[in-house]
């Protein structure tokens, strides 16, 4: 038997959080469900054998126990209940009754015996920072995480914790994104690991845009991100991550300042003629205080002039329009510095104040002679 009562809003929020880690399809039916454990409170878990999310909510438990419910149907039932106190009852045969106001649902559940335990994360190292900071860092780097399984290590983001703070790096072979923030709470000294990109997308969602803290724990094989009453556990990615420090060129004699919004608008205009079927690089001619942009495909030709500050020394270089726009869009600044060398050298985007809290690198695309 399981019996508890809880506010609908709390259950709905918890179900939404853990459902993101539930397997869509599995040979183990329990993995398509949410594990509910009743003891001193109510704990809900979702696990797809790669990533697990569990959270605890306040509930009045009259009979302790555990049961598994299909995540999709349970979520739909809870969502449709009126905003009131929900009463949950399950008998010895795992038949479930949900009551809330005048509404009720009945549904068979599953035994929790077949539900695999989430991995235990042995605390080797940990670091604590504000949730809004980690949320922003993931958002501003995860777009550059590789989706190419040929290099599994690059399907995640590198976390480096040192006296410089927390550095996050993502790379996909065409671009690199780096964010750095100072830290106050480090337990265990310097350490580093690679977290899967898919798991980080979920970490971004469980982190609130507040100064509440999140703790990141590195274990031998797994990682845990703990924000309030919610924990996300995932595997560490193993392998040799790119030596990003040596991959970033340091000789960049051309340096111009760019207003992000203005350049994104110019790129967006010339990108109108570019499509998935008709791809073409954006041709950029960096001149004195302006960049001449153009693109030509079977859809037509587009041109624009973007004002900048600095001498581009008549450098002509091509870029993938989306990669350059992403770097400008996710850079946490209104104005950035673009550093260039030759038409076949990467473009480096950094803060105008020479701080090291972000860096984006975009590789060029070879241009055909016109």
Q: What are the roles of these predicted feature ranges?
A:
Residues 1-370:
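Structural preference for solvent-exposed beta-strand-turn elements
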């Amino acid at each position: 038997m399981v019996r508890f009562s809880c506010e609908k809003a709390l259950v709905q929020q918890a179900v939404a959080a853990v459902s993101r880690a539930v397997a869509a399809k599995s040979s183990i039916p329990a993995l398509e469900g949410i594990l509910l454990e009743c003891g001193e409170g109510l704990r809900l878990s979702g696990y797809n054998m790669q990533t697990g999310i569990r959270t605890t909510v306040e509930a009045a438990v009259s009979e302790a126990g555990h049961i598994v419910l299909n995540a999709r149907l349970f979520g739909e039932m809870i969502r449709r209940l009126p905003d009131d106190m929900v009463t949950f009852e399950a008998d010895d045969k795992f038949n479930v009754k949900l009551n809330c106001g005048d509404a009720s649902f009945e549904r068979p559940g599953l035994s929790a015996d077949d539900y695999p335990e989430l991995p235990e994360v042995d605390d080797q190292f940990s670091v604590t920072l504000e949730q809004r900071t980690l949320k922003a860092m993931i958002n501003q780097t995860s777009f550059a995480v590789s989706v190419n399984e040929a290099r599994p290590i690059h399907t995640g983001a590198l976390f480096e914790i040192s006296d410089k703070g927390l550095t996050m790096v993502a790379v996909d072979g065409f671009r690199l994104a780096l964010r750095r923030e100072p830290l106050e709470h480090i337990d265990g000294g310097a350490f580093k690991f690679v977290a899967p990109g898919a798991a980080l997308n979920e970490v971004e969602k469980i982190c609130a845009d507040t100064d509440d803290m999140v703790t990141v724990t590195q274990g031998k094989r797994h990682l845990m991100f703990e924000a309030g009453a919610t924990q996300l556990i995932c595997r560490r990615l193993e392998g040799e991550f790119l030596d990003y420090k040596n991959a970033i060129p340091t000789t960049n004699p051309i340096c111009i300042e760019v207003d992000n919004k203005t350049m994104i608008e110019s790129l967006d205009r010339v990108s109108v003629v570019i499509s998935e079927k008709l791809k073409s690089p954006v041709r950029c001619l960096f001149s004195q205080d302006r960049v001449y942009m153009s693109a030509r495909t079977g859809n037509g030709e587009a041109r624009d002039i973007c004002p900048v500050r600095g001498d581009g020394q008549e450098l002509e270089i091509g870029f993938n329009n989306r990669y350059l726009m992403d770097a400008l869009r996710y850079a946490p600044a209104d104005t950035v510095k673009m550093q260039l060398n030759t038409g076949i050298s990467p473009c480096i985007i950094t803060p105008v104040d020479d701080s090291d809290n972000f860096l984006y690198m975009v590789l060029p695309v070879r241009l055909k002679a016109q």
